[in-house]
Amino acid sequence: MSPEIPRLLRTGMHGAVATGVMSVVFAVARRRGAMPGKTPPRRIVAAVWPTAPRRSHAALAVALHLGIGVGAAIGYRIMFRGAAGSPISAAARGIAHGLATWAVGYCVVVPATGALSVAPRDRRDRQGMLLLAHAVYGATLGLLEHHVAERAGRR
């Protein structure tokens, strides 16, 4: 087995953790009224699979969101493998990656599903929270990857 496989799996786990942290931002935003209605993953499930039983929408949305977070993290690993620097530079790389993930998702992919409008035409409060949440995702991912690389002595 390639030595890169365990590293990619670890990065995938970091993506799942970062997605969980991002979901806390969503939960706080929803409690404060900044994200009314269904979450974007639930909207995507409803748009892409309208015949899915309603009771399964929540589980499908969680699986979708985790899958995207894991996949985006692996993309991060491929782009920034071996990048050196401080925790601040790792967080900055992560934030840039998180915002790029938001741009691809909310300016191209999600609108293509019919779940939401293109980001500039969507609600500003929702897109502001989505930007913040994706920045948090990226910072978390970047710091996790940096921490593990430092501990392993591989930068």
Spans of features found by a protein language model:
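Short amphipathic, positively biased membrane-proximal segments
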Residues: 1-155
